[in-house]
Swiss-Prot record:
Signal peptide: none
Coiled-coil residue spans: none
EC number: 1.5.1.5, 3.5.4.9
Pathway where it operates: One-carbon metabolism; tetrahydrofolate interconversion
Keywords from the UniProt entry: Amino-acid biosynthesis, Histidine biosynthesis, Hydrolase, Methionine biosynthesis, Multifunctional enzyme, NADP, One-carbon metabolism, Oxidoreductase, Purine biosynthesis
Catalysis performed (reactions): (6R)-5,10-methylene-5,6,7,8-tetrahydrofolate + NADP(+) = (6R)-5,10-methenyltetrahydrofolate + NADPH; (6R)-5,10-methenyltetrahydrofolate + H2O = (6R)-10-formyltetrahydrofolate + H(+)
Name the UniProt record assigns to this protein: Bifunctional protein FolD
GO BP annotations, alphabetical order: L-histidine biosynthetic process; methionine biosynthetic process; purine nucleotide biosynthetic process; tetrahydrofolate interconversion
Source species of the chain: Xylella fastidiosa (strain 9a5c)
């Protein structure tokens, strides 16, 4: 059973990503409604899906539903799995040139296309609402305005809903992917944390030590239970980005939840923690892309 408040047993409070994401979407809808009332176009999002991977289909459906809730107009581009890189590049070029399109979402992975990064770089950075383009990551590194990667930005929003300070805290990130771990480090540096990043070359004893000293622990590896809950520092805030399906069908994170919940002050559930925030932040970026296009 998920714990919703700090109980007498000192279990962690749950960072309910679904509730916080819904609140963010409601706030975005208010801004979109005001925009439309002022005679401006509603924000628009081109959603590009290649193939029919079940997980990708679910993710795209969730993003389309969120767009509809906020008042963002989504344009669907559902392409066959045999779509070539050249064909996808041509579509991206058309969307880049279309002033009625504010945001472009390329759902990853792209079947049959070995270098998705090359296509991500082709998206106009001003329409890169995923925040994956090197120019947008560079803006984040330089603490400049840009479209920030959705999952790290959503995690920062989650951290703001705890009663724990962020500035001056020790933060450990486990996992250094381009889309989560690396930009997460930049976000936390900007927030005033002292950041330690761990990866596959980090010796096990060093990994354990880094986790045990973390006031804020963010794990994004994609391996169930890779971080034992017993390692969590008492009172730490734990953000579990991993989502893994076990043989029995259960979805679990990268952190041993049953033991971590007894040590942390706040912890995200899996599912229902980081995932909804990523989707809501995508809508936030899309609205900001539309607002920037007005200037």
């Amino acid at each position: 059973m998920i714990v919703s408040m700090l109980a007498a047993t000192d279990l962690a409070r749950i960072l309910d990503g679904r509730r916080i994401a819904d609140d963010l979407l409601d706030a975005l809808k208010t801004r979109v409604d005001a925009r439309v009332a002022a005679g401006k176009l509603p924000p628009t999002l081109a959603v590009v899906l290649v193939g029919s991977d079940p997980a990708s289909v679910v993710y795209v459906r969730n993003k389309r539903r969120a767009a509809e809730k906020v008042g963002i107009k989504a344009y669907d581009f559902d392409l066959p799995e045999a779509t070539t890189e050249a064909e996808l590049a041509a579509l991206i070029d058309r969307l880049n040139a279309d002033p009625k399109i504010h945001g472009i979402l390329i759902q990853l992975p792209l079947p049959g296309i070995p270098d998705a990064h090359r296509l991500i770089q082709r998206v106009d950075p001003r329409k890169d609402v995923d925040g994956f383009h090197p120019q947008n990551v560079g803006h984040l590194a330089l603490r400049e305005f840009g479209l920030r990667p959705c999952t790290p930005r959503g995690i920062v929003t989650l951290l703001g809903h705890t009663d724990r300070p962020v500035r001056g805290r020790n933060a450990t990130i486990v996992g250094v992917s381009n889309h989560v771990g690396r930009p997460m480090g930049l976000e936390l540096l900007m927030a005033g944390c002292t950041v330690t990043s761990c990866h596959k070359f980090t010796p096990p004893q060093m990994l354990e030590a880094a986790v045990r000293q973390a006031d804020i622990l963010i794990v994004a590896v994609g391996r169930p239970g890779v971080i034992p809950g017993e390692w969590v520092k008492p009172g730490a805030v734990v953000i579990d980005v991993g989502i893994n399906r076990l043989d029995d069908g259960r979805l679990v994170g990268d952190v041993g939840f049953e033991s971590a919940v007894k040590r942390a002050s706040w912890i995200t559930p899996v599912p229902g923690g980081v995932g909804p925030m990523t989707v809501a932040t995508l809508m936030q970026n899309t609205l900001e892309a539309a607002e920037a296009a007005d200037c």
